[in-house]
Regions:
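C-terminal and inter-domain tail/linker signature
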Residues: 1-141
């Protein structure tokens, strides 16, 4: 397994293992994350941990399963296709406001584009269809 693949898998598997510290240990202090669907930038380890806890609050039973990892020829970049599933039993906090629990299950496919340097994640962007989440949770029809 390419070292970059190992790092990005550790990052995503930390969500599934309910272990944000495992993910944080391979995030550079000056890492820049961006949630493209929400239009939010999340700089550094603390922002990563806050986002982890925001998601875990909304989906306490949430599971993150990596489906594919493709590493670029230069070895710095990886594309990670993964699937998040969970039941919305907690408040879903977002840039659009806070939504009360719906008790409904959501299953959404994501794509992360991540850059790894010297064994640390230095940049990442998540792409997903937020309308799919809203429909599955009954927030829109």
């Amino acid at each position: 397994m390419h070292p970059t693949e190992k790092i990005v898998r550790q990052f995503h598997e930390s969500w599934d293992m309910c272990d944000p510290e495992r993910g944080a240990e391979i995030i550079a202090d000056d890492c820049q994350f961006e949630d493209v669907a929400r239009g939010e930038k999340q700089p550094g380890k603390e922002a990563y941990k806050a986002d982890y806890h925001r998601w875990r609050e909304a989906f306490p039973d949430g599971i993150c399963k990596v489906e594919n990892v493709i590493v670029s020829q230069c070895g710095e970049w990886a594309m990670v296709e993964f699937r998040n599933t969970g039941t919305n039993t907690g408040v879903l906090r977002s840039s659009l406001g806070d939504f009360p629990p719906t008790g409904k299950k959501a299953e959404v496919r994501y794509c992360s584009v991540m850059r790894v340097k010297n064994g640390m994640v230095v940049e990442g962007r998540d792409y997903y269809d937020s309308a799919t989440i809203a429909r599955q949770l009954g927030l829109v029809s």
